[in-house]
C-alpha cells in the first residue's frame, strides 16, 4: 500500500472487496469476471508454480491483506509478508486467523517501509512484488531503492518476481469522466457497494492520480459515499530493465501475463523474473 495513503482511507477499507481472493474471500462472488481485466484471475496460481520451483523461504513485499501470501503458506511454504500499512496488516492477520491454526506458524508479518527493508533473514529464495505494488510506490528513486532492498534479502540464487501493468495499454492522458467499475460486497459489512473510478493525466514524473468514490448501500437503504485518492507511477519496459540492472538484477524471463504469454506491445502486463548478478563480475565480462 502507498506510504501516502492513510490507514483510514476508503481504498484500504474496501481493499479485500476490490482485490478479492479466489481462495479465502468471505464473499466468493466478488471474484467475478472483472478480476480477469484487473489481472487477478491467474496470478496466484503462477506464484505457486514459481514457488514450487524455487522453494522457500518466500518474501512478499507490499503484501497487503494476504491475497498472495496466504495461498502460498497453505501450500506449505514459509512466508514473510511486509507492508508499510498497519491497517492492511491487521486485515491480513484477520484473514489468516480464518485458516487452519498450523498455518499461523508459517507466516511472519512485518510492518516496514519497503525502501528501507531491514529483516533478520537475508536468504529468501524468492521475493514477490505482486500486482502493481511497485508502481504504488510513486517515486522513481523509491522504486529503485525497493529493488535494491529486495536484492539484499535474497539468497545468491534467489529470484525476484515483479508483476506490473504494461503502460502502453494505459490512458496516459487520463480519463476525466468517472465510471462505475464494478459492484461487489463489502467484506466488513456484507453491504453491496459500487466503485466509481477516474484518473488524471500522467505528470512530468510519470505519476498518475487514481481517484473516485465508493457508494455503499446500507441496511436502511441509504447510500454512504466515501472518496478515495492515490498515486501510482507506471514503469516502461526498458526503464524497468535498467532499474533492475542498477539494483543488481538481470531479467531472466519477461512474459505478457500470468499464463506464460509472450510479451508484446498489446500485452496487459509485464510479468518479470529477475536474478541477482555481481556488478564487478558483470563489468569484467563486458571489458
Question: Predicted regions: what is each one?
Answer:
Residues 67:
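Conserved SAM/SAH-binding loop-helix junction
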Residues 161-241:
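SAM-dependent methyltransferase
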Residues 118-126:
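A short acidic, Gly/Pro-enriched loop at the edge of an enzyme's catalytic core
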Residues 231-287:
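C-terminal lobe and adjacent flexible extensions of AdoMet/dcAdoMet transferase-like proteins
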Residues 144-156:
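A short glycine-rich, Lys/Arg-flanked "PGG" loop and its adjoining helix->strand segment in the class I
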Residues 1-64:
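Conserved class I S-adenosyl-L-methionine
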Residues 71-116:
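Class I SAM-dependent methyltransferase SAM/SAH-binding core
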